[in-house]
Amino acid sequence: MFNLEEELKKLPAKPGVYIMHDKWDNIIYIGKAKVLKNRVRQYFQSNRNKSAKIVQMVSHIQYFEYIITDSELEALVLECNLIKEHRPKYNTMLKDDKSYPFIKITVGEEYPRVLFARKMKHGAGKYFGPYTSAAAVKDTIELLCKLYKVRTCNRNLPKDEGRDRPCLNYHIGQCDAPCQGYVSGEEYRRRIDEVVAFLNGDYKKIMDRLTTQMQEASEKMEYEEAARYRDLLMSVKQVAQKQKITADDVNDRDVIACASDGQDAVVQVFFIRQGKLLGRDHFHMKVAEGDSKSDIISEFMKQYYGGTPFIPNIIMVQYEIEDADTIAQWLSARKSRKVSIVTPKKGDKEKMVELAYKNAQLVLTQDAEKIKREESRTTGAMKEIAGWLGLGTLHRAEAYDISNTNGVESVGSMVVFEDGKPKKNDYRKFRIRTVKGPDDYKSMREVLTRRFTRGMREREGLEDSHGFSRYPDLIMMDGGRGQVNIALDVLKELGLNIPVCGMVKDDTHSTRGLYYNNIEIPIDKHSEGFKLITRVQDEAHRFAITYHRSLRDKAQVSSVLDSIEGIGPVRRKALMKHFLDIEKIRQASVDELMKADGITENVAENIYKFFH
């Protein structure tokens, strides 16, 4: 079971993305943090100063997970991509599906433009980003225009040269008007090269220049101008920060890294699409003696890419693998396009592989703890129950319940738990045949008698096997002394010896304890055994009442339709097959009713008049 306090203590003091799940494993919120430890803990502190939405979201959190990154900027971009992928319920602020902006330089033009772009189109120019602040990108473009006098207009140059007067940017000193021939193509290209160099990270010269201009303006007491340079300098620092979480091209690629503890291995895959990290997944691998991480990755690739429909252009792996060329040829044949397998040795790509490895190591550690928690809530819980009852072993348990409405459509349910987990293939349901009226004791006697008589006949080979021949180590009755005694009587009559306990409830219909060997055994409500008993009890009730309601609804439909002149079993079945439920039949017109098989105009009119 997920222990919130313990997991909060383990949060790292690193940037990353956190992912909140509800009890059905749905992702309900994704966020980013500069320091995961501080940000995630804030959700589980006092509700004071929290919005109603956050309070509600926190109330639905069952567990959380996280992905570590190397910077807050990387976390922001990853958060955006994951939210696009999963669209969590509580991330309402990002419903506009806005993408982070790029700076685009139309390098294919004779006089390239520096533009703001939301989408990246292959072959349409040179892109830088994505960046996290649209305002910073616009400020940076404005800065570049002021420093290098490059254009941002849509004029077709040199075709439109001299056709119109210079635009406003020329008059405010942000463009040297190549549209008028005021700057040569060679000089303009040199300026564009400097812009590209700046956006590639060579921005020290510009920052020094801005700093000098800011100081000079301050010394001249031109404080507004100094503040403007200061703000632009801050924007440059933000825009110029590099992020390895985004690749420098739009090639689709997977990044694969492996972590192993010698017994188990986790392979982490980062999925980079159109140059952006869209998500990640991890896979468990069985480790054979002598397997290296290179062997594990090689085997993973053969199994994974043999079953996935999409193969990226480039696969970046943590270690060089012996059969890389063969695997690459195989994948290239499957994709009908060259696939490269590379092992980065330096730069951002190596750091990206290292980041995948860190997350693989994190998953390996978390999964080891998760396995322990799962064992505690399943096999561990069964051992607790066995200990309370003094049973040697407890592998399989069956639980029974009865459901009816004032004795109408009475049914029984049998649910099975093995090693603390529901085994739904072995569930059985019983329609009560011999009992009239609401008598749960007699109904339970019939269910148990039928179940174990059928089991005995299957064991003797007198009937085909339908799963009844396997007996439980424990029978769990929904109730106390009365229900337990019914079960013991049935077993005694059939000559069977199976332990029986009752799941006793209090006045609020909540589980209180176990009734066994004529005594009620109190149990710790915080124990895993108690929680398992509650799950068993709830599942038996759910399975019984679901079956009962389905029979009751069918009976109500049959009763209503049978009251209509001209409707017999065949036409009733045809109507239900066509309309699916009684309400749609009630709302249908005469023409719509006649579309069902066997429904004539006269019969359709009878049905319509009956409901109207």
Curated annotation (Swiss-Prot):
Location relative to the cell: Cytoplasm
Signal sequence interval, chain numbering: none
Gene Ontology CC terms, in alphabetical order: cytoplasm; excinuclease repair complex
Gene3D superfamilies referenced in this protein's UniProt entry, alphabetically: 5' to 3' exonuclease, C-terminal subdomain, GIY-YIG endonuclease, UVR domain, UvrC, RNAse H endonuclease domain
Keywords per UniProt: Cytoplasm, DNA damage, DNA excision, DNA repair, Excision nuclease, SOS response
Domain of life: Bacteria
Domain UVR intervals: 204-239
Positions of the GIY-YIG domain: 13-92
Gene Ontology annotations of biological process type: nucleotide-excision repair; SOS response
InterPro entries: GIY-YIG_endonuc, GIY-YIG_endonuc_sf, GIY-YIG_UvrC_Cho, Hlx-hairpin-Hlx_DNA-bd_motif, RuvA_2-like, UVR_dom, UVR_dom_sf, UvrABC_protein_C
Main location: cytoplasm
One matching Pfam family: UvrC_RNaseH_dom
Gene Ontology MF term list: DNA binding; excinuclease ABC activity
Family, as annotated: Belongs to the UvrC family.
Function field: The UvrABC repair system catalyzes the recognition and processing of DNA lesions. UvrC both incises the 5' and 3' sides of the lesion. The N-terminal half is responsible for the 3' incision and the C-terminal half is responsible for the 5' incision.
PANTHER family, alphabetized: UVRABC SYSTEM PROTEIN C (PTHR30562:SF1), UVRC/OXIDOREDUCTASE (PTHR30562)
Self-association and partners: Interacts with UvrB in an incision complex.
Protein name according to UniProt: UvrABC system protein C
Species per Swiss-Prot/TrEMBL record: Lachnospira eligens (strain ATCC 27750 / DSM 3376 / VPI C15-48 / C15-B4)
